[in-house]
Amino acid sequence: SASSKVETYLAYDLMFYINNSDVNKIFEGTPETIVPGICTELGIESGTMAATGVNISSMPCFGKKAYEAIMMAYTAAAKQNGSKYIPLMTNINKVSVLEKGTLCGAVMTGDYNLIEATYKSTLQKLVNRVLITDKNNNVIKTVEDAASIQKYGLVQRVLKQNDGEDATTQAKKMLVTVESSATVSGVPNDFRAVSGYSIIVQETDTGLYGQFYIESDTHTFSCGKAQMDLTLAFENLMDEREIEETT
């Protein structure tokens, strides 16, 4: 800006290309071999890939974003081994996939580097009962969280099941408990604390004590001070993307 004599730069890492580029082919193999192939196609160097050993016989990705293809492959593995995965940049210019929630190594405590902490919980997305119906709208099964109903009251949804399908798994995914989140700020900054990893926080006033999952991170340098601001989650959730069946 000419008036303020301040130059502002906006920089993207190479995940920009993963998020905005399409792929158009049928992939096969393990996620840890599929993802480097995607990176090679886009001219991006690949880094460490979380090992799964899960073989995917066919994964059609016609006109899909590269990010979606990566998550489809690792979602297939997650269904078998129960792990959570996330792609991110490592060593400045390499796309890697790691097990989401891996401890970053940083610890934030009130007597050392923690300068601010907030905590909140909300019932806005609460769902603790799902009624599964047939095509004629008859209830054929109920999936519920009895403890949540007793504690918070009943919020239910209706899910229609298609012929020949079992909607139980989908109904379980629709259950949502109280959502808790927190934000913390710390000085000095620690570059190990980035989204996708987890961190240890020890702050007794808010009750933030234990391992939390970093959902977003901001690292600021101003007036000789390096500060990190983190948004934390209490659950380790993965951005799941299903492989679509071809007809």
PLM feature segments, named:
Residues 39-44, 75-79, 201:
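Sec-exported extracytoplasmic/periplasmic mature domains
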Residues 24-32, 62-70, 192:
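Solvent-exposed, acidic/flexible segments
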Residues 71, 83-222, 234-240, 247:
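Acidic, small/polar-enriched beta strand-loop surface segments
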Residues 1-13, 220-233:
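Short, solvent-exposed secondary-structure boundary/capping segments
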Residues 40-48, 54, 239-247:
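Intrinsically disordered, low-complexity terminal/linker regions enriched in Pro/Ser/Gly
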Residues 16, 25, 57, 124, ...:
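Flexible, active-site-adjacent loop/turn segments at secondary-structure boundaries
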Residues 1-50:
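Surface-exposed cap/loop segments at beta↔alpha junctions
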Residues 6-18, 48-118:
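Short beta-strand-centered interaction patches in the first periplasmic/extracellular domains
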